[in-house]
Amino acid sequence: QNELSEGGFVIADESLAPLATGKFLNTAAIGVASKVLGLDLDLVCKALSEQFGKKDEAVAKENEDVLKKAYQWSASQKVSVKKLSEPKKNSRRLMMNGNDCIALGALAAGVKFCAFYPMTPSTTISLNLIKWADSAEIVVEQAEDEISAINMAIGASFAGATSMVATSGGGFALMAEAVSLAGMTETPVVIVVGQRPGPATGLPTRTEQAELEFILHAGHGEFPRAVFAPGSVEECFEVAYRAFHLAEKYQGPVFILTDQFLADSFRAVEPFKLEKYPPVIAGCRNKTIEEPYHRHAFTESGISPRLIPGLSKHLVITDSDEHYEDGHITEDLDIRKRMVEKRLKKLEGLKTEALKPDFFGDKNPSVLFVSWGSTKGACEEAAALLSKKGMKAASLHFSQVWPLMGNQFLDILAKAKKVISVESNATGQFARLIRRETGFEIKNNVNRYDGLPITPEYILKGVS
């Protein structure tokens, strides 16, 4: 009871103990919660009957008796919450979690190859694609390890298949060298990293946001990348779809950073209108190519024509060594310098397409919460709660954390009297990134790193 949040109440205490014993604990909890939420007892009993339909009749009867008694006990406590509204007629929604939406976004983008080695909390992305593999003509390969998985994806992409991998921080640690390979060969690949508390095995079934700096700098050498961090289940779909298009356009690795909380959080979402999401077309197809064809030709944008081996008369050559425009290796110092600059030119293009952060709340806030990834909802709710108390509050959320465009948000930060970074890590990694890229120092932080998700109450407690 001491841990109740503002407006919270106790729905069960010791007087319920005789009912909520042993194997009937969950059934009693359902009975109590059903009454509090105003659910019809007959409907709940019907659902329970379906759940226990395959068990012994006596077991089903015992559970139904406990359910009814717990429901009646709850009624005697005279505790209730705002009644749920009736759903809109003829309104169909999808019950999906973050990983479901990433998989669906990848499907909409036309993913054709996914390699993975199972690792919580990202595994269900690949398992979803396995379910759709036959109908969508996707190859999903469970590799022997993460090194093989990402190299398979890079190879498949070079051969013309829109490709991805899904892993967690520990698994991605094994992929870092191959990320450099994608950078050097300018090969598109989407890499989903589901964060969980580390170091090492850490807390494998809990949540954290401690891999931002790792992802920003993973892979030896300098080459461009984009990093997304969706803030909601719906954004998981949008970001996944966008990631594949950017990977193909700018020919390199694009990351999607999630975490256990977002990956496993279910939400009712409106159906996505897939006709609005044309799939990625890998490589330059049906386009006139200047001869002789050079895979790594110098261009003003840094983006070279990418042909798919075997789909034209041209020979497609690349290498992990530094190379000439035609893909053959070289140690020519001038070529080396020009190639580094060519690859980094693509970062300027990525900046022009960077997603603007989402702003929520008062336009001239006294308190501004800055967040990225899964803390979006908690920050917006915390801002709304402060606003109800008469305080000007707002939230600024980043669904793309690299590259950053300071001109998109510095004015907003400057207007706020107090800026607070909210992150599920111990060191304020995103706040440090903002300072490094823009010079703006966020002096106030709310950090959580015990493995539990950040809540509005946790934020407000940190503010006070």
Across the structure, where does each feature detected by a protein language model lie?
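Flexible, low-complexity linker and terminal segments
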Residues: 95-103, 107-109, 239, 244-464
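Short coil/turn connectors at secondary-structure junctions
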Residues: 5-9, 79, 90, 109-114, ...
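Short gly/pro/ser/thr-enriched loop/turn and capping motifs at secondary-structure boundaries
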Residues: 3-5, 17-18, 123, 147-150, ...
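Gly-rich Lys/Arg/Thr-decorated short loops/hinges at beta-loop-alpha junctions or inter-strand turns
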Residues: 52, 76-91, 106-111, 130-136, ...
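Thiamine diphosphate
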Residues: 113, 120-217, 226-247
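A short, gly/pro- and small-residue-rich
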Residues: 1-15, 182, 186, 430-447
